Amino acid sequence: ESPWQGGYLSGIIGKWHRGSHPVNHPLNRGFNEFYGHLGGGHRYFPELLTDRDIFEPMSDYESYFTYIVRDHQTVETDQYLTDEFSDEAVDFLKRNQDKPFFLFLSYNAPHLPLEATEEYLSRFNHIEDPKRRTYAAMVSAVDDGVGELLATLDELGIEDDTIIFFLSDNGGVSKKNASNNKPLRGQKGDIWEGGFRVPMAARWPSAFKAGIVYDLPVISLDIFATIAGLNNAPANQGRPLDGVNLVPFVNGEDTGVPHEAIYLRKYDQQRYAIRYHDYKLVIPKLNAKPQLYELSEDIGETNNIANAHPEKLEQLDKMLKEWTSELQDPAFLGLTHSDAWIKKRNKQK
């Protein structure tokens, strides 16, 4: 909501996954435009879409078959989903080139189900595994789309005034779609490094030198803090941000670390972790004994050193418990409201 309050026209294209209740609709959460789907995944070919009621599905999988939505109205589509979102994003840039804008382009690809057009599949005939081949094709479609966006910004002459962040939302699902997170341990949904540690790229010719590689850990919450910092948005002392403005760190003006500690929680499965500098404490499941790893020497998290460093284990465990004590239970998980939210609502009636 902050960019909207700062005079920006804001739009989201693609996957929303912030709840399907009308109160959680993007247009009720600060966005001016929405084109996409409410659930966490979707079918890629328009002939597979059968449900016009976007609020009827009660599970993420059921929502995969809903029609695409423009603002509040379902629309007929005739393109491969990734190409559809790319074209919409290019159109958004052209329509709003003369005004401040914020665009959240949330590609569904390469999320399951594995579906790609022959145009993209034909680029990877050398890959024998059909899952891996389709996965590569889906990523290639995203690559083409991002290339179109960058070219459009250049053609419109607004590339120097536009900051771009590109990242994934989680690690690959190696057991289902042949993605590969090696040398990291784990996959999507895990609190091992393979579950959440992903690359992030940024482009802003006015400030970032091309080719810079920044190795210290950052988090997706830094994106909001960076945008707020660039807009000189006043800080809300009652609601401090978890993220930081990355510009001085990336440009070398600040030689410290953006985050001394990074905290992780998989609420619905009671998985927790904290990374403090190069040490990482992991609680892989409810009531499990904490494990300790030294990531600079063991990026694959294979050697549990908890018994050898009890003082470090105790320090990180205390920090993690203090952090979790400040958290609220999530209001919804995926498409629908969580049990905790429903119980709280019923008590208030």
Predicted regions located by residue number:
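Formylglycine-dependent sulfatase
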Residues: 1-291, 295-325, 329-349
